[in-house]
């Protein structure tokens, strides 16, 4: 093996045969270091190439090439620190707005120092796609797309003007306007070219994204994953991310999916399988390999990769192959050049070649997958389609209930044109009130959308209808879907069942389901009814889809249409009729389910590479509302102190280009601010839902003169820290176990003198800060699961929380906590917040912080109100030396 001292990356530069493209040869580098590339997982090879290519820059060393090259000796089970330098960054408007606010605030700070603000400029290309703000206000109408687009523009005028300013102020940030599509689908269909040109070299496409579903790009052989705003900001400034070389779990796929089984059924099966895998895959790479991969289209692979965060993995990676190249060509891009490049780099997979070595290798026969749904509260809770009714009945039977059947008051159309007339109807347990074809997981898959359209066509031709009161919507991930559904003659049949295109964005999947008919909402709020939603999304956490809908089931787009017709989830659609035709005859699911041959033939007739090119060329200018939007200009943003959307954040007060690192301090006499349950999501910690007038953020905004009708959502106001701080732990379904029986942002405040009092978390945190009392949060298993929401770390940090003590952490949120200076501390095995018998009256000391090492120990002392105390050792989840530098 070559001595690292002798390694010069320039010596491995070659020219790709038949082209003028130069590249850094990974096989040549591997030969120099004695690395057997064939044994190294495909997902690690682009990372190894990036380390080797960057030796001598930003502290990257040849020793790190050696370290990752020896991965096969330990399969990721040893804590080896390596750098990852992403080639580009993607983000959406909710996560990207705070990032641009941070860059704008840094420019303002630099200007106050008398320096050129333009020195604050991202060094890595970043694309921000506006996709998270369109709401399903109006659905089921030919005017829905226009109405929702106009409402989106009006509600977000100030925020969109700020983003437009950012596009002209920062050379390396591109803003992709609203109504273009969902960031991950736009990335897959347009932004990704299969490779990058960096410093005049052809390199593998690598990225990070400020959204947990960034791994959807893994389907195209792109190494990338979701991070929070803190890590993304550093990457945009060209800094490598330091990470531990991961374990890589291989999933060998064999066989093919059976007739009538969809990619959605497959990904729900994989999600269940990997969540039940001993040890889990949190913080690990999952790599799909084997002959079965050849039987999955690129969009099917994208559906699987998209749900990596739901099964817990950092990535769900498919190596680049002929299918990847074919997809690039089918969507209007060059596929031959990337394929030649990946073959030259030994990064392309060919069926039949020996498998690399993995930390563990699992097998899945695609022929064993069955029609499935997941719910009612977690994406990993897969169930066979036939069990849907049984599972709903079990969920509805929980708790002390008195189920009601309510007659809903008939309703006329409203003057604003949002709600259609609603005749009198009964509302009971299991009734579906939302049926949404939504989310990048499935709307990026033409086969699934065409299947939904074919099912709608058959149902429509039979005279079947969706019951009144079911809010139906179709929100494709890009306008390309509208093009092929229209060409196939299927959009008209979806329209007939109420699945009109209502927006291009994340919509219902991120909680932007919009209001239900007022009489429906009133019935759900005032009576004991457990209603349901069915959606083709990737998450169904409680309170996420709609605050009044308690059960939510994930399923494929054609099944969403079928269940909308059925109108209730308390049914076995495999044996019971889902409705009647125009003559009153029973119709079963099998009668209208399209065959694989029908789907394939329709795709061949309506899919066209030219449509992809033209759609994006025509849409990148944005709708008229975007083109006509006035915005500031210049390198420095003119902050408006009265703005309720965009505020200069206080992090950069006293900003210096040479900020000294403070020593870490031990913590004494801390109080518990919140005690969380298992599976506390970032939605629980920092919700993005509609702002209720009686909530702390709502009351604050009203006090600032904002009208109740203009409160909008917490997601839209992420650029205003005054609002966001009042929302922390404020999800209406979140439970603070310090106060059993309560939900939302309330806690028990224990003053240094006097009796405890119940108050908002924001007010309690403010009082603790005034007293000089540190605070901690206790959690359970998988603390911080869900979206890569930086405010779920920013918020607690700004409230004064010094440490989160939990049984386990999800990867992205743990990294965000570190980036915000909040210690993630892990309880010993078999010790839980419940076994510690905590109630909030205790105080806590944390010692060993001042001498902390990566994955070191911190001593926790619990002082109880009765004078007793207890000590135990916690594991610091500061995993790397670079994380220790951040904290």
Residue ranges and their predicted role:
Residues 1-886:
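Fe-S-dependent hydro-lyases/dehydratases of central metabolism
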């Amino acid at each position: 093996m070559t001595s690292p001292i002798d390694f010069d990356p320039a010596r491995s530069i070659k020219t790709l045969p038949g082209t003028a493209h130069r590249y850094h040869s990974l096989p040549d580098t591997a030969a120099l270091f004695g690395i057997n590339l064939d044994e190294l997982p495909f997902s690690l090879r682009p990372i190894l190439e990036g380390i080797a290519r960057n030796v001598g820059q930003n502290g990257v060393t040849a020793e790190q090439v050696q370290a990752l090259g020896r991965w096969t000796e330990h399969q990721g089970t040893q804590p080896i620190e390596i750098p990852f330098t992403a080639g580009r960054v993607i983000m959406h408007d909710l996560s990207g707005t705070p990032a641009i606010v941070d860059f704008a605030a840094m420019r303002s700070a630099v200007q106050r120092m008398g320096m050129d603000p333009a020195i604050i400029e991202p060094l890595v290309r970043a694309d921000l796609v506006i996709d998270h703000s369109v709401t399903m206000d109006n659905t089921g109408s030919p005017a829905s797309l226009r109405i929702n687009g106009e409402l989106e523009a009006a509600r977000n005028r100030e925020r969109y003007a700020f983003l437009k300013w950012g596009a002209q102020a920062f050379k390396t940030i591109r803003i992709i306007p609203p109504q273009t599509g969902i960031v991950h689908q736009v990335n897959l269909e347009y932004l990704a070219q299969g490779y990058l040109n960096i410093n005049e070299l052809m390199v593998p496409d690598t990225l990070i994204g400020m959204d947990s579903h960034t791994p959807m790009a893994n389907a195209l052989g792109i190494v990338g994953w979701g991070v929070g705003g803190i890590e993304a900001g550093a990457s945009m400034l060209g800094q490598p991310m330091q990470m531990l070389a991961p374990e890589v779990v291989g999933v060998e796929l064999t066989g093919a999916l059976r007739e009538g089984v969809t990619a959605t059924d497959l990904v729900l099966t994989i999600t269940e399988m990997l969540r039940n895998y001993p040890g889990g895959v949190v913080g690990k790479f999952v790599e799909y390999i084997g002959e079965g991969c050849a039987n999955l289209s690129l969009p099917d692979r994208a559906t699987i990769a998209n749900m990596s965060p739901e099964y817990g993995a950092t990535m769900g990676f498919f190596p680049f192959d002929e299918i990847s190249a074919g997809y690039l060509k089918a969507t209007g891009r060059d596929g031959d050049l990337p394929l030649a490049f990946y073959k030259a780099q030994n990064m392309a997979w060919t069926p039949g070649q020996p498998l690399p070595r993995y930390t563990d290798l699992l097998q899945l026969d695609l022929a064993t997958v069955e029609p499935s749904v997941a719910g009612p509260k977690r994406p990993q809770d897969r169930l066979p389609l036939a069990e849907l009714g049984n599972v709903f009945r079990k969920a509805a039977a929980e708790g002390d209930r008195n189920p009601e059947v309510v007659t809903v008051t008939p309703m006329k159309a409203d003057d604003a044109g949002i709600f259609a007339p609603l005749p009198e109807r009964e509302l009971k347990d299991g009734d579906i009130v939302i049926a949404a074809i939504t989310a990048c997981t499935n709307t990026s898959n033409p086969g699934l959308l065409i299947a939904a359209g074919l099912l709608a066509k058959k149902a429509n031709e039979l005279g079947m209808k969706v019951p009144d009161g079911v809010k139906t919507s179709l929100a494709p991930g890009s306008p390309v879907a509208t093009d092929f559904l229209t060409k196939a003659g299927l959009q008209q049949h979806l329209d007939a069942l109420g699945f009109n295109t209502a927006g291009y964005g994340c919509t219902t999947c991120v909680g932007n389901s919009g209001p239900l008919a007022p009489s429906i909402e009133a019935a759900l709020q005032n009576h004991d009814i457990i209603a349901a939603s069915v959606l083709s999304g990737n998450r169904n956490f409680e309170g996420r889809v709609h605050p009044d809908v308690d059960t939510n089931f994930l399923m494929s787009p054609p099944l969403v249409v079928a269940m909308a017709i059925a109108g209730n989830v308390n049914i076995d659609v495999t044996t019971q009729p889902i409705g009647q035709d125009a003559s009153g005859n029973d119709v079963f699911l099998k009668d209208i389910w399209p065959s694989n041959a029908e789907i394939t033939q329709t795709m061949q007739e309506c899919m066209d590479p030219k449509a992809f090119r033209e759609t994006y060329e025509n849409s990148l200018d944005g709708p008229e509302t975007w083109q006509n939007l006035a915005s500031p200009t210049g390198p420095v943003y003119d902050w408006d102190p009265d703005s309720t959307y965009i505020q200069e954040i206080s992090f950069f007060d006293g900003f210096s280009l040479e900020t000294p690192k403070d020593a870490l301090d031990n913590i004494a006499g801390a109080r518990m601010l919140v005690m969380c349950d298992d599976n506390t999501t970032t939605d629980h910690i920092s919700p993005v839902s509609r702002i209720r007038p009686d909530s702390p953020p709502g009351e604050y905004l009203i006090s600032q003169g904002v009208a109740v009708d203009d409160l909008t959502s917490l997601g839209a106001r992420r650029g205003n820290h005054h609002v966001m701080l009042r929302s922390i732990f404020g999800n209406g379904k979140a439970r603070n176990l310090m106060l059993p029986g309560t939900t939302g942002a309330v806690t028990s405040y224990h003053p240094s003198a006097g009796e405890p009092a119940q108050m908002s978390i924001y007010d309690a945190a403010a009082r603790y800060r005034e007293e000089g009392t540190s605070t901690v949060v206790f959690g359970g298993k998988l603390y911080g699961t869900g979206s890569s929401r930086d405010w779920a770390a920013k918020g607690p940090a700004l409230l004064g929380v010094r440490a989160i003590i939990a049984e386990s952490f999800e990867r992205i949120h743990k990294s965000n906590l570190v980036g915000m200076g909040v210690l993630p501390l892990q309880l010993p095995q078999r010790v839980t917040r419940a076994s510690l018998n905590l109630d909030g009256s205790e105080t806590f000391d944390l010692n060993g912080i001042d001498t902390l090492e990566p994955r070191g120990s911190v001593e926790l002392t619990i002082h109880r109100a009765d004078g007793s105390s207890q000590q135990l050792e916690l594991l610091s989840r500061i995993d790397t030396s670079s994380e220790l530098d951040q904290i």
